[in-house]
Amino acid sequence: MALRLGQLGSGPWWRAVRGDYAQLRAPSPRSASACVCRLPGTAGTQPRRGLGHGSSAGGGSRLGTGLAAALAGMAGLAAAVLGHVQRAEMVPKSSGARSPSPGRLEEDGDELARRCSTFMSSPVTELRELGRRPDDMKTKMELMIMETQAQVCRALAQVDGVADFSVDRWERKEGGGGITCVLQDGRVFEKAGVNISVVHGNLSEEAANQMRSRGKALKKKDGKLPFTAMGISSVIHPKNPYAPTMHFNYRYFEVEEADGKMHWWFGGGCDLTPTYLNREDAVHFHRTLKEACDQHGPDIYPKFKKWCDDYFFIAHRGERRGIGGIFFDDLDSPSKEEAFRFVKTCAEAVVPSYVPIVKKHCDDSYTPQDKLWQQLRRGRYVEFNLVYDRGTKFGLFTPGSRIESILMSLPLTARWEYMHSPPENSKEAEILEVLRHPKDWVH
């Protein structure tokens, strides 16, 4: 099923938000997993099948119980529960500081329909439910990540010009589901995945114990801890060795105690992994993220930049995965609305921070030696994701997890050579120096 974004307005879910809810039906497993969304400017291209397309793609993820099941499809959400090694904080800005507008979601059904018409798929939550609670943070976050997914996919498809994003919609029997969009074997991108997950249920005992170990002594009701988790996660691997890989992830989590007390927090980040160092690109990427952070306080970028450098560290290699960006977790201050506005601002910075860099380098000439070095660096990327990334490890060791979406972050190709070491003063050695000793790119 090939769709243009502009044609989504004729679908049944579009009619539903205008009041005809009886016509709203969940897509069949086959049609959902086979969907290919063609974006403006890509007419006439051949549809390509993405990851997660198979017998288990559309019929539910068959997940286990608790949080492990809930994470099905976005490993980054596991880090939101199990990876709180630090607590992110934002201090309220002075009254003289510029404050972004709240961006309140309009309750009018036509406005919601107009906004949803640009998405890659209908939202995971029923539109009637979203319309009933426009001011709820779960609604705001779900619509924001759906919007971000569409914006990123549209921008990447326009850059590639050949390949389409497959749209793989999956459901979770315990509650919620997700939308995995993958473009692979394109002209510019070897593999680009943009995944959304919106899940809810009860925390597993393991997850509850992890929270208690971090000082969150949550009280169960009848042995259960209800939770909601949602987020967007993306990894983009271009073909050209001079175009860097980029990753971003933004998520929201709620847990309700027995007495009705609600705990909530945000997490996420955005980072760049170049094969070869281009200082102009590094400055552009970090400056764009800094400008986004600075809208919410002058001390945020330095703190989250260091956190990123520390987190994406391959200890057995003594290297960072890339040149960093920002990373934060357990963000629950100064208020839910301000924290959301910060996350939204960061999500809006994804396209302007990265797409100009890809456009600049996607047609650069390169040698077989350049490609070889790219494959070796991709090997490092795989090592970090499989050995250190908390969300990936948790998902892989959890029975019933949706493996296709968890491994979406891995490149199509990578390489390992025994005792490989680049020559001194080479451009390969230059990037290694930066990976071993992180730099300040904006001062």
UniProtKB/Swiss-Prot annotation:
The active site is at residue 247. GO terms for cellular component: cytoplasm; cytosol; membrane; mitochondrial inner membrane; mitochondrial intermembrane space; mitochondrion. This is Oxygen-dependent coproporphyrinogen-III oxidase, mitochondrial. Its EC number is 1.3.3.3. The modification N6-acetyllysine is found at residue 393. Gene3D superfamilies: Coproporphyrinogen III oxidase, aerobic. Residues 90-111 are annotated as: Disordered. Homodimer. It catalyses: coproporphyrinogen III + O2 + 2 H(+) = protoporphyrinogen IX + 2 CO2 + 2 H2O. One of its GO terms (biological process) is response to methylmercury. NCBIfam families: PRK05330.1. One of its GO terms (molecular function) is protein homodimerization activity. Belongs to the aerobic coproporphyrinogen-III oxidase family. The record marks 316 as: Important for dimerization. The keyword Phosphoprotein applies.
